[in-house]
């Protein structure tokens, strides 16, 4: 084969010979010399086309670039080729950044490295937020240090000059202004005012039987606040800084009798102590954990010579009539005198004024034993509810006392017909509390006709207290929307006694009277005669 191919190449190279034959063909076929001449010379391997880069002229932005170009003409001429390749990659970046900074950066780079390796850029937003967080932390630490210094100065230097007092007052005002500065929040975190109030109710605690001295005296108020924060040290620090944010007094009887606005009467301290020396209050804690633990830690404790009633607003304690006692024949007003004294008209030594609420706390705690652990610490009384008028705070003459233990009810019934002066000068009427069913038109129903549960009713109660009647009615209307409106989702209720009974309507036999027509009489006579047997016997 090699020899034949050599001969073939020799025959093709000779231009004079026209009739060339190939041995591997079947016959003697002639080859066209014009076609054969095309394959005489080879062009060789194909070379890749060389693309020449387009030279782009840089725009002049300012006089500083002109000065640098005049000084560094030689260096820029050597690096023009490198800059052309880098301009294609960094064209977008060069439009944003200044040309002066780019030229200085190029001069420092080595001319051999055409493509530089870029380091991963840091996230500017993360670094900015980190810096802001550090600054806020430093500011908070400074404020805490300043507060601690101020407290030490106030405690140590009470007998100071008036000039120094003025300077301290100025510092206090400036520090209070700094404390009032709040960190801005996003609108998704701020929320609506209604949702804020509901969230605030989870951190709110109700106080009953609070001494009215806390309104009149600043020292008494400080004592009360210190007592309310006494258990916060036992809470874990990880849940947040626990403290008492605010306290507001409610159900206060004013001496003006409604002629003066309540705020003005409160500012003047015109409080009517003749009706009752106690009042109610609401305390707001900074965390939900503190508000949850406050009832268990503070209920039944003594502060300002009165037993404190503590209960949660969001999750109030259950009223159990089996552990309750009804107490009647109480004084309407606390300064009421003994009726037997007016009849006898005898001069006696003046005794202390009556105090219905505190007297019930002390009397039933002293005369009930219950469990030894409970009696040794705080007593067996869980709560005392004296029914009073809203505006005048005059009592209705009866109250309810609830115990922790059901055994204490039997011991409390033994106090019927007894009196305990001076706080309870009248004879008490003690009976068991009865559970009276509330008469309602019907249960609240949703859009699908299902009865709403206890959770919805408790929410309605809180809405009525926080937002008033109009706000509660608005929330009630929103709650009746369909589930697609993101209102209330019903997931079922727990089984209770008697709920498993299925009510089926059955036909009552004998409810309708028997017919008294002719056919009924004939049937009765037929049955009386013994039926078919009686007929055949005849």
Curated annotation (Swiss-Prot):
Assigned GO CC terms: nucleolus
Keyword Transmembrane helix: no
Biased composition (Basic and acidic residues): 127-144, 151-173, 182-202
Keyword Lipid biosynthesis: no
The protein's role, per its UniProt record: Involved in pre-25S rRNA processing.
UniProt family annotation: Belongs to the RRM RBM34 family.
Name of the protein in its database record: Nucleolar protein 12
